[in-house]
Amino acid sequence: MHGMIIFIGKVKLNKNADLQIAESEYTEILKEIALEGKIDKLVSLAQKYLESLSNRDYVKFEEKYIKLIFYCIAMNLKIFRLKSEMEVQRKYPDILLIPKNQTKGYRGIMIEFKYLKKEQAEKLQEKQEEARKQIEEYAELEEIKDIPNLNCYTIVAVNDKLYVQKCN
């Protein structure tokens, strides 16, 4: 990916896009995840970032860049322990958001990502199924089962469009 991405209050992408992220937006994302187990606002913000990238940014684009965008946003959600590719019995869930205080009934989130280039769009359902199977396997692991109120999602990006499915 060309250029630098900085996710602290103000975001600069390719020196052209100037996205302001209000503290209240993070608060809304946090509430939605912690209290409802939903990721709609998180996905919406990530979608904005993807749409602001240039076509050149997508030349050698991969799944890890989608995950990185979500990871950088989630770093600001301070009530969660954020885990990326946490090894669990030789399996690696892409992102886990685990509530730091598990006595408050906050929801946890597990996300599995996949990426397709625009010309591979016809493989969307296949990738969604692959991601769903993976996340269902992860959900059966003891360390994952121990996370209370866990909501699981798959996100397949086709170039700059995100397709989200809830798995439980």
Task: Describe the residue ranges of each PLM region.
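Domain-level recognition of nuclease-like catalytic cores that cleave nucleotide substrates
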Residues: 128, 143-168
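Extended alpha-helical interface modules used as scaffolds for assembling large macromolecular complexes
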Residues: 1-131, 137-139, 149, 167-168
